[in-house]
Amino acid sequence: MGFDSVEEEWFSVWLRIAKKRGMVDGIIYHPSSFKLAPKQTIKEEVQLKTKTKIVDKFLLHPHKYTPDFVFYISNLISRYDHGLVPCKDNIVFVDVKGVYAGGRHNNSSITFPISQKWVYAKFGIYINKVVPEKFFRKTFVPKELTIGKSGKVLKKWKDYPVF
């Protein structure tokens, strides 16, 4: 499966391990999108040779938002201070971000908070922002991510809890 970022791939590995441990289930990558606003048009009168015609003139594109992951959590995850906010029925929606998701060249750093608020206001669903490096420190880093090409533990993960 191709992921949009290395952080999404890391989080999918975490989810796979967490599923084996009974902490999560029903994992879906890129579930159905939330339709937040339809395309906007305005009526405009166009003069033809012999008559006038009313047409829809394009004004704004539709806006939708697609989370990176959705899954169910069980009580077994409560041993960790994971910070995930579930919706009803313990469903968790997640958008995965890198450590440095800021900057004016990263569109997601601007659009995500707006979409997050909009989804919550319209559907009552909270989208959790997960930065794997921070999330792994609170929970665990999957062992397979800690080993580099040389077979040694990567310095990046040396102080993290490993499972």
Residue ranges and their predicted role:
Residues M1-F163:
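Electrostatic, structured charged patches in enzyme active sites and in nucleic-acid/phosphate-binding
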